[in-house]
């Protein structure tokens, strides 16, 4: 869980980073699911992921985790795609 300020709005981001040799094994999806569940358990009402628009694998992880693509925005000088989920909601 990483606190972020996106378009002047405080958000909490689900983040993960895996070494290349672990890609394609479902580990990022498993980590994202666990992070999502834990975030909601401790009381966060909304979680996001900020993803490079060219990172198709991470976008798939976000979708598998139930996050919806909301928008593209500029974050720290780079274009990112914002995926989000609210507690007890789906796309």
Predicted feature residues:
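Acyl-donor (CoA/ACP) binding surface of acyl/acetyltransferases
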Residues: 1-91
């Amino acid at each position: 869980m990483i606190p972020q300020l996106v378009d002047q709005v405080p958000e909490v981001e689900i983040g993960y980073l895996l070494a290349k040799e672990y890609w394609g094994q479902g580990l990022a999806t498993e980590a994202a699911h666990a992070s999502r569940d834990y975030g909601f358990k401790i009381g966060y009402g909304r979680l996001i992921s900020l993803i490079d628009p060219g990172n198709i694998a991470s976008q798939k992880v976000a979708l598998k985790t139930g996050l919806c693509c909301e928008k593209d925005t500029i974050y720290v000088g780079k274009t990112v795609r914002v995926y989000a989920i609210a507690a007890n909601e789906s796309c």
